[in-house]
Amino acid sequence: MQANELFTQPNTILLDGGMGTMLQAAGLKLGAKPEELNITDPALIEGIHAKYAAAGSRIINANTFGASAHKLAGSAYTLEEIIAAGIANCKRACAPYGALAALDVGPLGELLEPNGTLAFEDAVTEYGRIVRAGVAAGADLIFFETFTDLYELKAALLAAKENSTLPILASMSFEDRKSVV
């Protein structure tokens, strides 16, 4: 099934759960870059994806949430290598279940102006690089998740629309002083 077809159905669509918590349970060390496991331990990543798909998730997020130049600084692998491996692992795990592989994109890890030093245009450029890598790797859709800055999400969405025709999902997290919504 194609992503566009999935979204035209009247049924509930289940997404996967947290990759980070599963990796921590598997022994991910503090300070490690979980996205590097796409290359160094693909079997672990595929196994986690397969568990979610077997449980009925129709959309599985690739292990690419932190794949940005800022967050991958010092990595032995390029952003493009990590995203390509992440999408490939996800697609292999999804195939037996007919689930879709989403390019999972999180915040860049830098604050945008005026609260930080990253210019809006530079954020659009960086998200464009991420989206192009996901498209080239064969992602079925894009999921922008856990954004707290509407301005940064706007940069991500503009980049996605400029560099892709894939369906897009987006989620935000807001604090209300008591809980995260």
Q: For each of these PLM feature ranges, what is it?
A:
Residues 1-181:
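Domain-level signal for soluble alpha/beta catalytic cores
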